[in-house]
């Protein structure tokens, strides 16, 4: 035009924009909840003005470890895919182990029963975990014995030990088990017949007649609730107080041992022994002297004598 004539053609190219979409890195200490971060950063040439995309971030990490912070995107309606070369880069989600000490307190259960002659038992333990920790009873296993049984009076232990408990959750790197053993205690029952609830009966020892020998008279003690006659020196002891040879009253002190406790007393008598004196019959004509006759004594203990 004007001072010029002729024509020629010039071409040019509109190139695609290079866009990099990068999801966020994130990290936290394990707390039992999922670690997520839905931030996506647009880099490279970025989107043209008023163009963009929406994002669906699906990355999640709950347990100790790491994983990609995955996501998907969808271009908005005014944004043509043909105008872009889009590269996705996933960030890293990392959960680290709880670094503080977790103390798990195991307390074996305890119970006390009075002796009845039947088996008693205690089972189980209670768990207490450091306040504020997310550690739970399901995070460890128990491989020991948590039940104790017994019949006789005494104390029985479960045998709980720290090594019976194992942490199975790698999210916690410092778990300590503090264990108090469980126990069953069976206390002796009263042996006193006057304690009606005890069900104990005792016979009265028989009286004896003096014979010059020791009279250590027995008695029978029965536990009517177990249906058993008690055994001397296993269930009780006997102490004889007083002279057990000569005439008088003897006291027996009965003291419970083993499965029985307490004491009571019984008494019996050693009564006088009867003896007879028989004299012979005799006669004479008076001569101013005394008439005497022999005789015999019956019922006297050998080695003893009576004068008359």
Q: Where on the chain are the PLM-derived regions?
A:
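Solvent-exposed beta-strand/loop surfaces, strongest in extracytoplasmic domains of secreted
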Residues: 1-308
